[in-house]
Amino acid sequence: MRRGLAVLLPFLPLALAWQPALDLELARQVVDGAYSRIPPLPTAVELSPLEVRVLRGGGCLPFPGSRPVWARVAGQAEVVEILAERARNEFRRVQAEEVLPEAKRLLPDGHLRVYLRLSGLKRLEHRAAYTLGVRLKTPEGESYVRAYRATYLDDWQEKEDGYTGTLVFYLDFSGKPVDPKGPLEVVFLTESEKDCLYAFTVDLGAFY
């Protein structure tokens, strides 16, 4: 039994927490997981169903317009996993030394991606009206960090109640007081003209 433990211990991942700057050792484990050499590591946290609360405004629930139904938050580890899975699908082998620099180019140190799936959007043009960020609390008070970039996945479809699909937001926490193991309060505005500010909480200690 002790001999088996001695073999397994070197392959145990770090304590679970978001890695703002993914290191090579953890990247190797993410790649190994993508090739099924070890169990996959948790590289993202998903919230489904998405529990949303109102921070400001009246008559904001039910949503006066489109509504978010699912969220996913991830960092550099997810990018490494995606690159490794893409290579595997193309029957290629890649090493962490290859994909980690590319992952850091696509999603720099200290950055996160937030995926937000919507339902009931009346016009595709209204996707750009969504504003997402985080609310940070410190002893000096609170501040907001807005996503510096927003894109869309190619999963948009027209349903009976409007369009459904996924927005992707990019956030930069460089130099910000964010606990990689703690809760993160994500805030957003929808396309509605009502002054409604919504929020949901993400556990950064649930993924790498």
Predicted regions and their residues:
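Conserved functional micro-motifs across diverse proteins
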Residues: 18-208
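Sec-dependent N-terminal signal peptides
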Residues: 4-15
